[in-house]
From Swiss-Prot:
It holds the Pfam family PDCD10_N. Its EC number is 2.7.11.1. Gene3D superfamilies: 1.10.12.70, Phosphorylase Kinase, domain 1 (3.30.200.20), Transferase(Phosphotransferase) domain 1 (1.10.510.10). It comes from the Eukaryota. Its cofactor is Mg(2+). Homodimer. Interacts with PDCD10. Interacts with GOLGA2. Interacts with CTTNBP2NL. Interacts with RIPOR1 (via C-terminus); this interaction occurs in a PDCD10-dependent and Rho-independent manner. Interacts with PDCD10; this interaction is required for the association of STK26 with RIPOR1. Part of the core of STRIPAK complexes composed of PP2A catalytic and scaffolding subunits, the striatins (PP2A regulatory subunits), the striatin-associated proteins MOB4, STRIP1 and STRIP2, PDCD10 and members of the STE20 kinases, such as STK24 and STK26. Serine/threonine-protein kinase that acts as a mediator of cell growth. Modulates apoptosis. In association with STK24 negatively regulates Golgi reorientation in polarized cell migration upon RHO activation. Phosphorylates ATG4B at 'Ser-383', thereby increasing autophagic flux. Part of the striatin-interacting phosphatase and kinase (STRIPAK) complexes. STRIPAK complexes have critical roles in protein (de)phosphorylation and are regulators of multiple signaling pathways including Hippo, MAPK, nuclear receptor and cytoskeleton remodeling. The modification Phosphoserine is found at S4, S300, S304, S306, S309, S325. This is Serine/threonine-protein kinase 26. It catalyses: L-seryl-[protein] + ATP = O-phospho-L-seryl-[protein] + ADP + H(+); L-threonyl-[protein] + ATP = O-phospho-L-threonyl-[protein] + ADP + H(+). The keyword DNA-binding does not apply. Changing K53E: Abolished serine/threonine-protein kinase activity.
């Protein structure tokens, strides 16, 4: 369904007469966010430093519901552990989203200069847990916890960001069953499209803890599609290496395949690893200073993506599998079920044609680029699937889901 940019409404939308280019001074670009470019800026009225996310709604037409969702969630949050949202302005087809500026970068940025020690990890995890405890108390699920979505201020304050796939639980709907998130960090029950709740964030936190310790999540050397098969089938990842027993136990607690046995965020704040090792957030400024030194030494070739994580220009997904841009998997909502930017009834849909089938065919054709007859057969098969999808929207999703179920069943039958 097409959307006219002028018809877009989001919480905190300012009077359309107000010109954001007069109210704010746009400075250097600091990254590419979930749906557009992000700039450092100055509020000319207060001289406050802000982050300005600018989205061309004509180009981001398919993502408008996700943009509304992110702004809706942020506008409802009032926590020092969640990125603050100040308001939005519409100028032509450009939506200006004004947010809190966090100049310390993302945890993923800081990891580029090297892994963290356990005191730094415990300190960062404690702040993430405070953010999750707040969100879960508000019946919200982040659904995309990872180092790229954890931002720091220059003083070391830690905040959760990127709420484009966040979900809202109601009193009558205590679990969700929508396939969203990022494969490497995704909980088994989310991949299987089973009913899930805030405990899915706890699994992602456990994977993030490993990421902070090792510099990357488990299975990062594998194809993301294979990871989707393996996470529900295999035993949970464990932290291997010279780490303390309490840290390994913290991760094991988060990565229980049965969500009912995972602790809550509030319970994890009392875990021995957090209590004994966490320090004041100012302790994290050493990581920020280290990253600045690392960049000054000429190690950084890519632009930092501190204020948004979808492109993750330095991430292992894009480096290892250039044909796949497999970061955050986002839902495709039914516009009829979106009211005031909040999706009331999420559709259980994975965009398999664009996320899985098309990239898979591209890889097959690349592998057999010198075999004309094989490539022609691949193209014919790809066209047939596209025709079937056009005639019966959603049929590809059902087919891939069924293939995953069959694969998992066969794998389980073959297991000793």
């Amino acid at each position: 369904m097409a959307h006219s940019p002028v018809a877009v409404q989001v919480p905190g939308m300012q009077n359309n007469i107000a010109d954001p280019e007069e109210l704010f001074t746009k400075l250097e670009r600091i990254g590419k966010g979930s749906f557009g470019e992000v700039f450092k800026g100055i509020d000319n009225r207060t001289q406050q430093v802000v982050a300005i996310k600018i989205i061309d709604l004509e180009e981001a037409e398919d993502e408008i519901e996700d943009i509304q969702q992110e702004i809706t969630v942020l506008s409802q949050c009032d926590s020092s552990y969640v990125t603050k949202y100040y308001g939005s302005y519409l100028k032509g087809s450009k939506l200006w989203i004004i947010m809190e500026y966090l100049g310390g970068g993302s945890a993923l940025d800081l990891l580029r200069a090297g892994p963290f020690d356990e005191f730094q990890i415990a300190t960062m995890l404690k702040e993430i847990l405070k953010g999750l405890d707040y969100l879960h108390s508000e019946k919200k699920i982040h659904r995309d916890i990872k180092a790229a979505n954890v931002l720091l201020s220059e003083q070391g304050d830690v905040k959760l960001a990127d709420f484009g796939v966040a979900g809202q639980l109601t009193d009558t709907q205590i679990k969700r069953n929508t396939f969203v998130g990022t494969p490497f960090w995704m909980a088994p029950e989310v991949i299987q499209q089973s009913a899930y709740d805030s405990k899915a964030d706890i699994w992602s936190l456990g994977i993030t803890a490993i990421e902070l310790a090792k510099g990357e999540p488990p299975n990062s050397d594998m194809h993301p599609m294979r990871v989707l098969f393996l996470i529900p089938k295999n035993n949970p990842p464990t932290l291997v290496g010279d780490f303390t027993k309490s840290f390994k136990e913290f991760i094991d607690a988060c990565l229980n395949k049965d969500p009912s046995f995972r602790p809550t965020a509030k319970e994890l704040l009392k875990h021995k690893f957090i209590v004994k090792n966490s320090k004041k957030t100012s302790y994290l400024t050493e990581l920020i200073d280290r990253f600045k030194r690392w960049k000054a030494e000429g190690h950084s070739d890519d632009e930092s993506d501190s204020e948004g994580s979808d492109s993750e220009s330095t991430s292992r997904e894009n480096n290892t599998h250039p044909e796949w841009s497999f970061t955050t998997v986002r839902k495709k909502p039914d516009p009829k079920k979106v009211q005031n930017g909040a999706e009331q009834d999420l559709v259980q849909t994975l965009s398999c044609l664009s996320m899985i089938i098309t990239p898979a065919f591209a890889e097959l054709k690349q592998q057999d680029e010198n075999n004309a007859s094989r490539n022609q057969a691949i193209e014919e098969l790809e066209k047939s699937i596209a025709v079937a999808e056009a005639a019966c929207p959603g049929i590809t999703d059902k087919m891939v889901k069924k293939l995953i179920e069959k694969f998992q069943k066969c794998s389980a039958d073959e297991s000793p």
